[in-house]
A protein has these predicted regions:
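Pyridoxal 5′-phosphate
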Residues: 1-407
Length: 407
């Protein structure tokens, strides 16, 4: 049985037509579409159990709290984490990186310590570090990306040192589809420093089976809306012993143990990092998204992504005038950023929309690397579980027609 053959039927959005044409959605790198089960799970809370979590002794609150905390355990199993207390809920991956950058810098780093990033990172994994580097007198170093859009591991070995305290890299590039060898990078870090290893899982977690114990990393960050869940929910996983060392960076209700007029003490991990009313309905939607993916199995999701990528590489290989930013590594994601000589990416995207094809145009929050390439913007096609070979064929034909019309 092919689990993906009729999968669009699970997603109400695909009942829409765009400009009298079937929707061809190739922008899952920005956000995924949502299956009916996720929408229904969230509606069920509002219709039947809605109440604030952790704070009520009545039935509705107890039911909602059980659903909400149950998602923490689902995330633990989904990542093969050591303990559900290692799962920190945030409002997204960006907030997750801001939390880590501020909490780690505040508690564990000293002036002159170094942070290593790659030059192909998303802004969410650059700007928070820039902000804390300025505040705490830290130094950021960048690892180059080679002509194949892969991380230069020789340069990593040269730049990492005992002064390196944080290495934070993408698990899957939202620009080129690069899937770095995380375990190899982990071994390089261990040989040369005691740095914390953080992985940006925003693109990785929706497409690959992630086992944090096997990878040997210290933290991973991802958002719910890219893996079939709603906006407004994200996850930081971190090793419990490290989380216990960190201080909260946001204060308020639900993260405290005792409050006095002149001081306060914190609740245990994970709650000390989750101030205020949490996005409990969004978390429950994330849990339904995880259930949906695990019903398929992440192994099959990964294989589908690989099959799409290989087909795309084949049909895109002869595109006239089109330059493609995509790694040629054996393992990569189904993410293709492109530009056409003498035609702006936004014009291409607007023209593709007339054919019902949805792609992203811009710098995809990887502006420094676009600048290095001398490109103002690209348009990007990203595939997911509800895409098939026909979607890629429609995209290619629409792209060729768009180029012909735009000159």
């Amino acid at each position: 049985m092919n689990e993906f053959q009729d999968i669009k039927d699970d997603f109400p959005i695909f009942e829409r037509e765009i400009n009298s044409k079937k929707l061809t959605y190739l922008d899952s790198g920005a956000t995924s579409q949502k299956p009916k089960t996720v929408i229904e799970a969230m509606n069920n809370v509002y219709l039947n159990t809605n109440a604030n979590v952790h704070r009520g002794t009545y039935v509705l609150s107890a039911e909602t709290t059980q659903l909400y905390e149950g998602v923490r355990n689902k995330c633990k199993n989904f990542l093969n984490a050591y303990h559900s207390d290692e799962i920190i809920f945030t409002k997204g991956a960006t907030e997750g990186f801001n939390f880590l950058a501020n909490s780690i810098s505040k508690k564990l780093l000293q002036p002159g310590d170094e942070i290593l990033l790659t030059e192909i990172e998303h802004h969410a994994n650059i700007i928070p570090w820039q902000m804390v580097a300025k505040e705490y007198q830290l130094e950021i170093k960048y690892i180059s990306v080679n002509e194949n859009f892969s991380i230069d591991l020789d340069e990593l070995k040269q730049k990492i040192s005992k002064k390196t305290k944080v290495v934070s890299i993408t698990g899957e590039s939202n620009l080129s589809g690069l899937l770095p060898d995380i375990k190899l990078i982990r071994s390089i870090i261990k040989e040369n420093s005691d740095a914390l290893f953080i992985v940006d899982g925003a693109q990785l977690v929706p497409h690959r089976k992630v086992d944090v114990q096997d990878l040997g990393i210290d933290f991973i960050v991802f958002s719910g809306h890219k893996l079939l869940g709603p906006t407004g929910i994200g996850v930081v996983w971190g090793k419990l012993d490290i989380l216990n060392e960190l201080e909260p960076v946001s204060g308020g209700g639900d993260m405290i143990e005792e409050v006095y007029y002149d001081r306060a003490t914190w609740a245990p991990v994970p709650h000390k990092f989750e101030a205020g009313t949490p996005p409990y309905v969004e978390a429950i939607g994330l849990g339904a998204a995880i259930d949906y993916l695990e019903n398929i199995t992440m192994e099959k999701v990964s294989q589908h992504s690989d099959n799409l990528r290989k087909y795309a590489q084949n049909i895109f290989s002869d595109l006239d005038r089109v330059s493609i930013i995509h790694t040629n590594e054996e393992f990569a994601g189904c993410t293709f950023s492109m530009h056409v000589d003498q035609i702006h990416a936004t014009d291409i995207s607007l023209m593709l929309d007339t054919y019902g094809v949805a792609v992203r145009a811009g710098h995809h929050c990887v502006q420094p690397y676009h600048r290095k390439l001398g490109i103002d913007a690209t348009f990007r096609a990203t595939g997911y579980i509800y895409n098939d070979e026909n979607d890629l064929d429609v995209f290619k034909d629409a792209l060729m027609s768009s180029i012909a019309m735009l000159g």
